[in-house]
Amino acid sequence: NSLVKDPTKIEVLGYVCTVDGNVVNTLDYNLINPRLVTKKKSRAKLVLVCGTSMNSGKSMAAAACCWALSNMGYTVNASKVTGTASLKDILSMNDAGADKYLDFTYLGYPSTYKLSEDKMLDVFNKIDLKYANDPKKFWVVELADGILQRETAMLLAHEDVRSRIHKLIFCSYDAFGAIGGLQVLKEKFELTPDAISGVCSSSPLHMKELSEFSNIPIFNSADANLDFMKEILLSKKKRSKLAFQS
């Protein structure tokens, strides 16, 4: 951002090494080692949370989903699959009721920035194999940044990810961003959300503008209604292909 001053410049003086002289790499300390290598057909229901950009309200929406599902008596595991290490995001899901929680750092990546498609899918699949095997449970996943961000777009474009989605929650900072995001989701990824949330859901004006443009339900993640969340997260209805009001 041109309004933000340049970051502090540092000079690398050396590497941390083992007693044998090998450079320490976080990838050598992977904490996720699934016993299974092939996914069972019946799996935990994936609630995928994505949005227009950073600070659009994704983490709060993901936490609201964890809160609602855990209050309905379901066991929920939660993950953040793309982005840069931010422990508070997965801790907020744990605080909201998620049982097991983790992100890509558990696989040794401090960030998913510039990872190849194969490595991104490996991150997604290993977490899926580790914590989403039980069809009686839910798996809430947040994708960082916006849907056009490289690694997030990479996953949304892949059929292995899209076919896993049980419910898709789309977050936006404002109504206009949500409207544009809905079109991008439909045209680029062939996806239609089951609900809209994020910062815009806290504004009556934004909600009014959205409801005039789209028939997709909107839930306020800052003041979630359990009955409404139940209707959104447990409904067996397939996502409508007609997201926009005529």
Model regions and ranges:
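N-terminal phosphate/diphosphate-binding loop that engages ATP/GTP or pyrophosphate donors
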Residues: 68-112, 183-187, 205-213
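A short secondary-structure junction signal
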Residues: 59-63, 89-90, 152-153
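Short gly/pro-enriched beta-turn/loop segments at secondary-structure junctions
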Residues: 42-44, 74, 88, 96, ...
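Walker A (P-loop) phosphate-binding motif
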Residues: 29-84
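Long, low-complexity, intrinsically disordered segments
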Residues: 241-246
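Conserved catalytic-core segment of NTP-binding enzymes
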Residues: 2-30, 83-84, 92, 117-133, ...
